[in-house]
Each structure stands twice: as C-alpha cells, then as structure tokens.
Amino acid sequence: MKRFISIIVFAVLSVFVASAQNDTIKVLAIGNSFSEDAVEEHLSGLLRAEGLTVIIGNMYIGGCSIERHVKNLRGDIADYRYRKIDPQGTMQEINGYTLEKALADEDWDYVSVQQSSPLSGQPESYVLLPELVGFVRARIPEDAVMMFHQTWAYSEDSSHKAYVNYDRDQMKMYNAIVETVAA
C-alpha cells in the first residue's frame, strides 16, 4: 500500500512539476473536507517542498456532494467558504462565495471536483457530474486541466454514519469507489 501511495504522489508531483515553467501553478478545488486535507495541506506542501510557486483555492462546504455543487451553480448560491493560499503560504478565508466568483478569481491551471465521501462509491450519485464539469470548463482557460479528486475509503474503525453504506468494510468501500470512478 505504501508503494502504491508513493507512486501516486510521484505521478501527481510529476504532472505539476512538468507544467511549471518558472511560473505560478494555480489549483482550485471544488470540494469538501477531503479537498481541505488533500489539496490545502498535502498538495500545497508537496509543491512548495519542490520549490514551486503555487496558489491554492478551495471552494469548501463540509460533506458537499456533486448534487449540491450543481444546485449551487444553478442558483448562483453563495454557500461556500473560499479558502485561498497565496504564494507565501498564507491562507485567507472568505465566507459566502459562489462558484462563478471563484472560477473568475484566477486563471486556474488545474481545477478538481469531487464527490462527497458517503456517495463516492455509488454510481447513481454521479449523474450531475457532466453538468458540473461543463460549467467549470466554460469558465476556465482552454488549456486548464480538469481533474477528478477520488476520495479514499474510511478507516476500518470509522464511526462515520454513512459507513453502513459499505457494510462497515473498508475494502468494500474502496472497491466501490474505484469501480465507480473507473466507470
């Protein structure tokens, strides 16, 4: 498992390093607590450790699903906490932000979207993903890269109430997520 994680981290860093041409890399996550952990903390730190200049944006709503993101974009609902980390690593948080406003804030190089963890292994919960991606794609530079942030399975001893969706079985949840995302 550690080898697999190392390969993934190397692959992700390689993509960002290859695209950095003595320029600032701008990454926007449209997500939830998983994007807070993975993008704000881990990716930001890894890129800075490589000596890269990076701006991280995170449109954050705890537990936010694709369905809720689409509801927010359709209604231009200012329901997000926009957390932005500047090139010096300083974070600013603004409450009451819309997707439209965040997408216009920078010429983003990378934009990730994700599903909420309870729904991440349920294929029927992704029916609105094309609408979310289309909305984002129409508002970012043509050469920007859209990414899907795959969530991870809960820990074996998780007390998360949605863990019952996977019979409280970490491998069952992991396999459901992988199969759903690959479809």
Q: Where are the regions that the model predicts?
A:
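Positively charged n-region of N-terminal signal peptides that target proteins for export
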Residues: 1-4
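A short, structure-level motif marking secondary-structure boundaries and short turns
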Residues: 27-29, 166-167
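Conserved SGNH/GDSL esterase-like catalytic core that processes O-acyl groups on lipids
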Residues: 26-28, 37-129, 142
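Boundary at the C-terminal end of the N-terminal hydrophobic targeting segment
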Residues: 18-22
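Residues in and immediately flanking transmembrane alpha helices
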Residues: 15-16, 45
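Bacterial N-terminal signal peptides
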Residues: 6-15
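Alpha-helical cap/lid subdomain in secreted, periplasmic
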Residues: 96-183
